[in-house]
A protein has these predicted regions:
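C-terminal scaffold of the Radical SAM
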Residues: 18-22, 41-62, 68-345
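Local cysteine-cluster metal-coordination motifs and their immediate loop/turn environment
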Residues: 28-39
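Basic amphipathic alpha-helical segments that dock to polyanions
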Residues: 355-359
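A short, conserved structural fragment
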Residues: 360-369
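Minor-groove-contacting beta-hairpin "wing" of winged helix-turn-helix DNA-binding domains
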Residues: 370-374
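Short, amphipathic alpha-helical interaction segments positioned at domain boundaries
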Residues: 378-392
Length: 392
């Protein structure tokens, strides 16, 4: 793979008309740092106005990147609910002015404490039609450990406000927390079911370096939950939610029928998308690009008319490995016929040999031309998928 730093290259270097499916907008601000989070953000809002101006300017600089209708928009972060409705409108109006926007889904990630009745009402004047609410836990002591800014009661109120205002709602939950018991997790699942939201994301807590959680583990203040217990909690969520009528369509995601996340599904299908804002990633054809992960640098580069991009040109093996990684994390699985015509004979022999081996182990199953990982092994999916990776 080739890494290109485009801060020194002319804008025309990447002005191709890609068939984008969606736009991701990174809002790099948070009220405070969560114990487990290693995403790019700032807890100071002093540059928010300058950031919004830079974001609008970046759209102008990248107007030639998109020639297909933008069908999904996703405000991620960070904490996008730090934006006021008028700021969201400025951003979406500029998107509509710059690109061909035909939105089917416009998602705003939000913290429960931000979703007051007044704020949710103001969002009705925007293009946003879906709220992804970072509940994480319904237990206040867990929220305090996570350094979250909301309470369990605020989570319930936020979902109620969002439902009453007519938004599609998704909630995030975290399992495999330190010392989490199966009983505690089952109580979380039952509370989520009471809300009956259209979409639920359930993530296993992961240990990321340079986080407060990593520091606590290093100092032996807390201990990671063992993998077997974490896997049992994953399977408990699957059994519970599917029994309640949810479709487990991707390892971490459940939806009521027809309510799958359209924007995120484009990632798993490797559909091209455009990322705006500091640290935001874009993908098209055989190229992945990402903006500088520094708010001040991002604002300065954009103000100077320079895109602060670095890019990775994917080789064939990289594209194939990504296809396997994304497809095998979904319930749909991977159609091996789509790879046969683009693999070299040597790659294909390795691939088919690995399929036979993993099928014999019971780690994958095959139905006609489609291979998939059975649910009972989904928690170990990344490990299983890596066995298929082409390294040479």
């Amino acid at each position: 793979m080739q890494i290109l730093n485009l801060t020194l290259y002319p804008l025309s270097y990447l002005c191709h008309s890609f068939q984008m499916a969606g736009v991701y907008i990174h809002i790099p601000f948070c009220h405070k740092a969560c114990t487990y989070c290693d995403f790019h953000f700032s807890t100071s809002l002093k540059n928010k106005t300058a950031f919004v101006e830079a974001l609008l300017r970046e759209m102008e600089l990248r107007k030639n990147f998109v020639d297909e209708p933008v069908t999904t928009i996703y405000f991620g972060g960070g904490t996008p609910s730090v934006l006021q409705a008028d700021e969201i409108n400025r951003i979406t109006e500029k998107l509509t002015e710059t690109f061909k926007v035909m939105p089917q889904e416009v998602t705003l990630e939000a913290n429960p404490e931000d979703l007051t009745e007044d704020y949710v009402h103001s969002l009705r004047s925007t293009m946003v039609n879906r709220l992804s609410i970072g509940i994480q836990s319904f237990r206040n002591e867990r929220l305090q450990w996570m350094n979250r800014n909301h309470t369990a009661e605020q989570s319930l109120q936020a979902v109620q406000c969002a439902n009453d205002a007519g938004f599609d709602v998704s909630i995030d939950l975290i399992f495999a927390l330190p010392a989490m018991t199966m009983q505690e997790w089952q109580q979380q699942l039952m509370q989520a079911d009471v809300l009956r939201v259209p979409h639920i994301s359930a993530y296993s807590l992961t240990l990321e370096s340079k986080t407060a959680y990593a520091f606590q583990v290093k100092k032996k203040q807390v201990q990671e939950l063992n993998e077997l217990d974490a896997e049992m909690q994953f399977l408990a969520a699957h059994d519970f939610f599917t029994e309640k009528g949810y479709v487990h369509y991707e390892i971490s995601n459940y939806s009521l029928p027809g309510k799958q996340a359209k924007h995120n599904s484009s990632y798993w299908n490797r559909t091209p998308y455009l990322g705006l804002g500091p640290s935001a990633h874009s993908f098209a054809k055989n190229m992945r690009c990402w903006n500088v992960a520094n708010n001040n640098s991002y604002i300065q580069y954009i103000s100077d008319g320079v895109l602060p991009l670095s890019c990775e040109e994917l080789q064939l093996k990289d594209e194939l490995n990504e296809t396997m990684m994304t497809a095998l994390r979904t319930a749909e699985g991977l159609n091996i016929e789509t790879l046969e015509n683009i693999m070299t004979p040597e790659m294909y022999r390795h691939f088919m040999k690995e399929i036979a081996l993993q099928e014999k182990r019971g780690w994958i199953e095959r139905k006609n031309a489609v291979i998939f990982i059975p649910i009972k092994h989904w928690y170990k999916a990344d490990r299983i998928i890596s066995e298929f990776f082409i390294t040479t």
